């Protein structure tokens, strides 16, 4: 009887130990599953933000200062952008613009030059829009604010929110056409407006065969 009792107690101890081990294992599994679920949710949110966030290029305008315009090159460009629908705020101080004419590639960074241009009648007039003066001859861009829904945009870290619209102002005199600074006629330009996060705005156009006006629509 004593041997049977000892065996029974031993079996009970083993059973209890197995239950405890199973409980600990279950706790570890549940904890790991919870952690993985949170990681998956965070990754899903991040992926959604990456897909939804980004920059949309609305229009691109070019400018030549020559008289007549057909004698000149495109020396300046204004790239109008807005956020994609559902996009988070985009810090324009971290944006880069990449432009290429197939022979040269230029990367522009934010110059820190920022101006409210909602009431400006001539965006390419250097008297009214000072960002052109501060970026002249450099691989940097200035920002002319066309529409600021929340009136919260400021120069140090200008943040583009849904409904906002700005013009990124760049000099294109780093390019050359027939020994003249600037972009010539019938030239294909490709590039991107690249935010820190999210989809880049696409630039892809061919300049007119003849420059009939000082200001021209490029894209």
Curated annotation (Swiss-Prot):
Keyword Iron-sulfur: no
Entries under Pfam families matching the protein: Arch_flagellin
GO BP terms, alphabetized: archaeal or bacterial-type flagellum-dependent cell motility
GO CC terms in record: archaeal-type flagellum
Key words of the record: Archaeal flagellum
An example Gene Ontology molecular-function term: structural molecule activity
Entry-linked InterPro entries: Flagellin/pilin_N_arc, Flagellin_arc
Propeptide: 1-5
Function of the protein: Flagellin is the subunit protein which polymerizes to form the filaments of archaeal flagella.
Protein name per its UniProtKB record: Flagellin B4
Organism: Thermococcus kodakarensis (strain ATCC BAA-918 / JCM 12380 / KOD1) (Pyrococcus kodakaraensis (strain KOD1))
């Amino acid at each position: 009887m004593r041997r049977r009792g000892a065996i029974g107690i031993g079996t009970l101890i083993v059973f209890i130990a197995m239950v405890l081990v199973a409980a600990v294992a279950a706790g570890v599994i549940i904890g790991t599953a919870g952690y993985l679920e949170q990681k998956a949710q965070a990754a899903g949110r991040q992926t959604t933000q990456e897909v939804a966030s980004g920059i949309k290029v609305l229009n691109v305008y070019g400018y030549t200062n020559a008289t007549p315009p057909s004698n000149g090159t495109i020396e300046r460009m204004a790239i109008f952008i807005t956020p994609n629908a559902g996009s988070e705020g985009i810090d324009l101080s971290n944006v880069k613009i990449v432009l290429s004419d197939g022979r040269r590639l230029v990367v522009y960074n934010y110059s820190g030059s920022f101006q409210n241009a909602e009431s400006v009648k001539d965006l390419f007039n250097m008297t009214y829009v000072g960002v052109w003066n501060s970026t002249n001859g450099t691989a940097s861009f200035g920002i002319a604010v066309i529409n600021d829904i929340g009136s919260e945009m400021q120069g140090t870290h200008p943040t583009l929110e849904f409904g906002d619209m700005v013009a990124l102002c760049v000099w294109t005199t780093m390019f050359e056409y027939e020994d003249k600074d600037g972009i010539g006629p019938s030239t294909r330009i490709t590039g991107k407006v690249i935010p820190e996060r999210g989809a880049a705005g696409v630039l892809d156009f061919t300049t007119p065969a003849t420059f009939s006006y000082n200001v021209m629509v490029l894209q």
